[in-house]
Amino acid sequence: MAKHLFTSESVSEGHPDKIADQISDAVLDAILQQDPKARVACETYVKTGMVLVGGEITTSAWVDIEEITRNTVREIGYVHSDMGFDANSCAVLSAIGKQSPDINQGVDRADPLEQGAGDQGLMFGYATNETDVLMPAPITYAHRLVQRQAEVRKNGTLPWLRPDAKSQVTFQYDDGKIVGIDAVVLSTQHAEDIDQKSLQEAVMEEIIKPILPSEWLNTSTKFFINPTGRFVIGGPMGDCGLTGRKIIVDTYGGMARHGGGAFSGKDPSKVDRSAAYAARYVAKNIVAAGLADRCEIQVSYAIGVAEPTSIMVETFGTEKVPAEQLILLVREFFDLRPYGLIQMLDLLHPIYKETAAYGHFGRENFPWEKTDKAQLLRDAAGLK
């Protein structure tokens, strides 16, 4: 592939699907705070004037679902009816059951190391050296644009902004290297009284220019700011939101494959989430070690079985050591059994609500973003 374009999108914390993700993970965090061994599968649905929280939860903890929901919506910024959604007046419904005992008997073990996977499935992790956080540039900058939108909305720089927003960035590549940005799309919900011209100028100056590196912008870069001309109705009034509907936004923006499992609302016994984090950790350490420029890891599981059913390493021809050696290094330095990866990444803590907007990867405060195995891998591979 010589010259080509690649596009990724992101959505803000006020997007309906992301509201749902954040509520699900806020419930998970509140439970893990009291009961680290809880089994949680929490799903959320949001629509005009209402939130429905459901799922299967087995725990000794008690949490106030309604209070957690209202606080989460309030923090996002939906605090008045003219925004189409109000944390103080929306209805909060709960439909929570317990996890099936048939699943429990496959997961729980007398020996924790033999803890089985909570379900079958395949998960992918990815890393590339095209950015400082070892993530693909298109999704990295799409996230940063909507993060900036939230920042200038909340700090009062652009007080007419509202919580719902989407971004999309198209990068130009030549022989695998970034040569520029071809197109930028940013759509943001706004108050009724701001005109289109003022909005476009402010978004360009306060959101786009501070985030996108000037060396990647040129006279042919196309900018689409609120291209429909109006975005007053947004959030749950504009669209219903569901947990787990933004799995590509949550991961690599389409640059890597995806096993199909969503993350939010799931405790770490669910390998959909924990093994995807572990696969990112493995891929990132391989790239950080200089063993490859790009790396994709696939891992798969059978329900109730501890050992992965498969591990695959793909380096797209960028490897500096033989592929067979990479597989051996992964097996030697990373414990990808469910209990092993939970311990390796210290996952039994309330760290998940923060993951639920702006991507689960590429933010250094998460334990799966550490590169503490990079030097070990490099030494074991015999690289100077």
From Swiss-Prot:
Disulphide-bonded residues: none
Residues where Mg(2+) binds: D17
Gene Ontology cellular-component terms listed: cytosol
EC number(s) reported in the record: 2.5.1.6
Region (Flexible loop), start-end ranges: 99-109
Residues binding ATP, per UniProt: H15, D164, A165, K166, R230, F231, D239, R245, K246, A262, K266
Gene Ontology molecular function, alphabetical: ATP binding; magnesium ion binding; methionine adenosyltransferase activity
Superkingdom of this protein's organism: Bacteria
UniProt cofactor note: Binds 2 divalent ions per subunit. Binds 1 potassium ion per subunit.
Residues engaged in binding K(+): E43
GO biological process: one-carbon metabolic process; S-adenosylmethionine biosynthetic process
Pathway(s) it belongs to: Amino-acid biosynthesis; S-adenosyl-L-methionine biosynthesis; S-adenosyl-L-methionine from L-methionine: step 1/1
Catalytic activity: L-methionine + ATP + H2O = S-adenosyl-L-methionine + phosphate + diphosphate
Residues at which L-methionine binds: E56, Q99, D239, K270
Pfam families for the chain: S-AdoMet_synt_C (PF02773), S-AdoMet_synt_M (PF02772), S-AdoMet_synt_N (PF00438)
Compartments, as annotated in UniProt: Cytoplasm
Cofactor dependency: Mg(2+); K(+)
Keywords: ATP-binding, Cytoplasm, Magnesium, Metal-binding, Nucleotide-binding, One-carbon metabolism, Potassium, Transferase
Residues passing through the membrane, by range: none
Family to which this protein belongs: Belongs to the AdoMet synthase family.
Role, per record: Catalyzes the formation of S-adenosylmethionine (AdoMet) from methionine and ATP. The overall synthetic reaction is composed of two sequential steps, AdoMet formation and the subsequent tripolyphosphate hydrolysis which occurs prior to release of AdoMet from the enzyme.
Subunit and interaction comment: Homotetramer; dimer of dimers.
Protein name: S-adenosylmethionine synthase
Source organism of this protein record: Salmonella typhimurium (strain LT2 / SGSC1412 / ATCC 700720)
